[in-house]
């Protein structure tokens, strides 16, 4: 059962679902809009060996970041020109990890799904690849996997980037996501790189 706007207000007001910060203007008919945070991760790898720790750089923006397609040529001169012309803090190509401003806590009988905004789809930018599912009992910020597929796209801190759709489960989970010892991303409060290498250290699922 998907929660409606009325349900979302009721769940937040009763503190069954935590969304911090919460903005009533971001409540849709059956969703809640979330906004882009200021922290990002860019991988520094030619090959992703998922058995190893992936080398990456973390950075913050004051205002905006330009995300370019992977095959978009960038050098120091082009990056400098882009920054000056478009007044952006950073210019990157390829995939970029980001995070929401919103910290979310779900009870054991509510799960959620993240979807990117259709307006971004119309400029061929995705803000998640496969990690749109949020298990019941999750606590943390939502990781964004950002890729531009056509032209460079400028994203701005605090702008709406996607929406959460909440669903009520038939029965509560015995053990919520954040209470499972093997949960890799429980309680994340900033952008986190992939911890997939831990799959080879345990037989349990994330």
From Swiss-Prot:
Active site, per annotation: 145
Binding residue positions for dCTP: 117-122, 135, 143-145, 163, 177, 184, 188
UniProt protein name: dCTP deaminase, dUMP-forming
Pfam families: DCD (PF22769)
Lineage: Archaea, Methanobacteriati, Methanobacteriota, Methanomada group, Methanococci
Catalytic reaction annotation: dCTP + 2 H2O = dUMP + NH4(+) + diphosphate
EC number of this enzyme: 3.5.4.30
Keywords: Hydrolase, Nucleotide metabolism, Nucleotide-binding
Biological role stated in the UniProt entry: Bifunctional enzyme that catalyzes both the deamination of dCTP to dUTP and the hydrolysis of dUTP to dUMP without releasing the toxic dUTP intermediate.
Top EC category: hydrolase
Record family assignment: Belongs to the dCTP deaminase family.
Any GO molecular function: dCTP deaminase (dUMP-forming) activity
GO annotation (BP), single: dUTP biosynthetic process
Gene name for this UniProt entry: dcd
């Amino acid at each position: 059962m998907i929660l409606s706007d009325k349900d979302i207000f009721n769940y937040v007001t009763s503190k069954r679902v935590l969304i911090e910060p919460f903005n009533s203007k971001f409540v849709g008919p059956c969703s809640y809009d979330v906004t882009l945070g200021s922290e990002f991760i860019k991988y520094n790898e030619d090959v992703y060996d998922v058995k190893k720790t992936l080398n990456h750089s973390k950075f913050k923006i004051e205002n905006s970041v330009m995300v370019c397609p992977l095959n978009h040529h960038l050098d120091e001169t082009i990056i400098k020109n882009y920054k000056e012309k478009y007044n952006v803090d950073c210019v990157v190509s390829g995939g970029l990890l980001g995070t929401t401003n919103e910290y979310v806590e779900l009870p054991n009988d509510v799960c959620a799904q993240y979807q990117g905004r259709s307006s971004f789809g119309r400029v061929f930018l995705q803000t998640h690849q496969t990690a749109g599912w949020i298990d019941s009992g999750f606590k943390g910020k939502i990781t964004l996997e950002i890729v531009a597929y056509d032209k460079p796209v400028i994203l701005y801190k605090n702008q709406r980037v996607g929406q959460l759709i909440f669903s009520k489960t038939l029965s509560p989970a015995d053990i919520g996501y954040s209470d499972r010892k093997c949960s890799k991303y429980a309680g994340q409060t900033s952008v986190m790189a992939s911890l997939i290498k831990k799959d080879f250290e345990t037989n349990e699922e994330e």
